[in-house]
């Protein structure tokens, strides 16, 4: 039977995770619908992503870019890419079976859904909330959480072993247990942690300052069949950066329409 793209249109929670596993077990790919969209916008997004239509064998996810500087694109991530991202991230963070992931960011964005896929691939305890709520986050008992700067300011950070921080420039006074990430939907979440690439990730800074990335967690293609990855496997991010004296990557700014997550 030809695999197809199946939408999950429900808030985060145990049922969402059950849906992901059920769809994958059937050989299909998952498209998580943004719960913040009104009904008309949801319908338009489902059409754009061609929900219900065929996908390739091995495709796991289609994730929508935010479209903040252009029309949202459907990023196709394979099971191999999702696994590579989960394994590299878990290795960098030193995740063990004693850890407990908390997902509280929108699951329609790769920064939120990647928490779920990491936990599933590493068999780590997982709590999925329908959204960010300060008390629920603080009292979750989780050891690992992915946040953005605006949510970081609203919690007690010392309650977590490690906080994975994405979504833009980190605050100057960030807690010592935070790890800053750089990545995008097309890279299946963060691929550079505190300026250092994850295992298997290559970085090239071109003469004009544009950051290029290569690694096993990159997208297969966009939903329309086009691909931003060149013949040698490099993804031009549209972001500008430079190498610091200590060998870490510093991201200076953005150009183009790819979205930092």
Model features per residue range: what roles?
Residues 1-37, 103-106:
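Conserved AMP-binding/adenylate-forming
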Residues 2-5, 39-60, 85-86:
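Flexible, low-complexity linker/hinge segments
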Residues 11, 50-64, 71, 94-100:
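Conserved pre-ATP/AMP-binding loop-to-beta segment of ANL
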Residues 23, 65-68, 101, 119, ...:
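Conserved S/T- and glycine-rich ATP-binding loop of Class I adenylate-forming
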Residues 47-51, 76-155, 179:
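AMP-binding/adenylate-forming
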Residues 59-87:
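Conserved AMP-binding A3 loop
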Residues 144-147, 151-197, 202-204:
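Gly/Ser/Thr-rich phosphate-binding loop
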Residues 212-261:
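Conserved ATP-binding/catalytic segment of the ANL
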């Amino acid at each position: 039977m030809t695999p197809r793209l199946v939408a999950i249109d429900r808030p985060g929670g145990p049922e969402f995770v059950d849906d992901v596993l059920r769809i994958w077990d059937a050989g299909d790919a998952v498209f998580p619908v943004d719960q913040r969209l009104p009904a008309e916008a949801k319908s338009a997004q489902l059409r754009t992503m061609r929900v219900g239509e065929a996908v390739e064998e091995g495709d796991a996810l289609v994730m929508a870019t935010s479209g903040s500087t252009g029309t949202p694109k459907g990023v196709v991530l394979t099971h191999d890419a999702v696994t590579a991202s989960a394994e590299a991230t878990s290795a960098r963070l030193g995740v063990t079976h004693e850890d407990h992931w908390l997902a509280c960011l929108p699951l329609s964005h790769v920064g939120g859904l990647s928490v779920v896929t990491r936990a599933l691939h590493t068999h780590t305890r997982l709590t999925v909330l329908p959204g960010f709520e300060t008390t629920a986050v603080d009292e979750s008992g989780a050891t690992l959480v992915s946040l953005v700067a605006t949510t970081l300011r609203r919690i007690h950070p010392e309650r977590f072993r490690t906080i994975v921080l994405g979504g833009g420039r980190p605050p100057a006074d960030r807690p010592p247990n935070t790890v800053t990430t750089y990545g995008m939907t097309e890279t299946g979440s963060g691929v550079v942690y505190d300026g250092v690439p994850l295992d298997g990730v290559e970085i090239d800074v071109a003469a004009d300052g544009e950051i290029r990335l290569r690694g096993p967690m990159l997208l297969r293609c966009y939903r329309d069949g086009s691909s931003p990855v060149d013949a040698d496997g490099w993804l031009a991010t549209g972001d500008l950066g430079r190498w610091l004296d200590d060998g870490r990557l510093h991201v200076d700014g953005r150009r183009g329409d790819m979205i930092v997550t």
